[in-house]
Regions:
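Sec/Tat signal peptide C-region and signal peptidase I cleavage site
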Residues: 14-20
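Long, low-complexity, polar and repeat-rich extracellular regions
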Residues: 1-2
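Sec-dependent N-terminal signal peptides
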Residues: 5-13
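Outer membrane beta-barrel
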Residues: 22-35, 42-164
Length: 164
């Protein structure tokens, strides 16, 4: 009887640590319009290059750590078709899982490479021109599959990025 009460007391001590806060978000972008051309109305294509549907989530693991994921899918607004460059599969943009904490973030999957992740902060109009000009015209591979990516915590307002 004493052993079972002791076991119950030990298990109840860990019961509170098992609870965590999680969130899942559905977001995206739709860029479409109507065009009147030669007296007829037609559905307009995307001016920004793509429409996207994104699923992302974060789970608080406690102790300042969290797990997260992102699935980003491109589609054609006119017919719902898969709209991926080069015939890539579904979810061809950012698709990764990761672990974050006081050490920074570690991600595994398909994602922007470090140069492109950094450039994105300067590309206010999603054209690529500002980022390309800012880096002296150097355009690395935008996304890479089977990537291990590390982003450091803020180091006096700066971050270190590395990906292989």
């Amino acid at each position: 009887m004493k052993k079972s009460l002791l076991a119950l007391a030990v298990l109840s001590a860990f019961a509170g640590a098992a609870s965590a806060q999680s969130s899942v978000t559905l977001s995206g972008r739709v860029d479409a319009g109507l065009i009147r051309q030669n007296g007829a109305w037609n559905m307009g294509g995307s001016q920004s290059g793509y429409n996207a549907l994104t699923f992302s989530g974060r789970e608080d693991l406690g102790g300042g750590m969290n797990a997260f994921f992102t699935l980003n899918h491109r589609f054609g607004i006119n017919d719902g078709s898969i709209n991926n460059p080069g015939g890539a599969s579904n979810f061809c943009r950012n698709v990764f899982v990761g672990l974050g904490g006081g050490f920074g973030d570690v991600r595994l999957g398909r994602m922007l490479m470090p140069l492109q992740e950094w450039n994105g902060a300067f590309d206010a109009f999603d054209t690529g021109y500002v980022a390309s000009t800012h880096t002296g015209g150097i355009m690395a591979t935008v996304r890479s599959t089977n990537t291990i990516y590390y982003r450091s915590p803020s180091l006096g307002g700066f971050f270190a990025h590395a990906g292989i």
